[in-house]
Amino acid sequence: MIVLGLGALASGGGFVAWDRLAIKRLAIVEPGRIVRGAWPGPTALLRLIERDSIRTVVTLTAINLDDPKYVAQERAIRQSDSRWIIIPMRGSTATTDQMAEAADLVADPANQPAFFHCVGGHHRSNLVHAAYLIRHRGYSANGAWDVVSRLPWSRPASDGADRVRIDEFAAQCIPVSFPEDHGHDAKADSLDRAHHDRGDPDPGPVRGGSLGNG
C-alpha cells in the first residue's frame, strides 16, 4: 500500500493534457460514505471531491509514476485536502489480502467519505465492493455477487474469475466492524442481506450522478 498525503506529492504546474471530464461507471456504495468508479480525469475527480467532500481516494491498481494518469491524479489530489492511497493490484484481479485491505480502508469512518476506483471501474472495483459487503455488512458470497453482478457494466456470464475470487474471499473472511461506525441500521442491513441472498428482484444500483461538463 502506498499512502500519498499533500506533503508527499511533488510540486508541479497545471494538469497534463490527459483528462476525462466525467467519471465512468460511477456508483454509490453507501450514500454519503462510499462511492466507486473508473479512473477519473483530474477535473472530474476534483468535482467529485468537492461535491461529496471526499476525504480519501483509494486507487486499486499498480501504476508507473510517469504514467499520465498517475501524474494528472497526483496533481489533482495535491489541489485538495484528500488523502490518496494506492493498493497495487495487478491485472484485472486482486489477492484476497488486497481485497480485505481495501475494504477496511473504505469502511473506516476516519477515511470517509471515500472514493475507490481501478482503471475501468469493473473487475477490481467489483471485488472490493463485494469484499466490503462481506467483511463489513455481513453478506454471503452469493449476496455480494448478486449486488455487483447487477451493475450495468458487469457481465455475469463472463466474469467467472471475479465470482471465484469473491467465493475465496468469503471462505477466508473474518467479519470486521469499526466501534465508531454507527451509520447503519442493523435491522435494515439484515433485511438487505436477506433480500440479496434470496435473489429477490433488485431495482438496480444507486448511481453516482453525472460529473461531466453539465
Residue spans for each PLM region:
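Substrate/cofactor-recognition hotspot
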Residues: G121
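Cys-dependent protein tyrosine phosphatase-like superfamily
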Residues: M1-A114, L127-G214
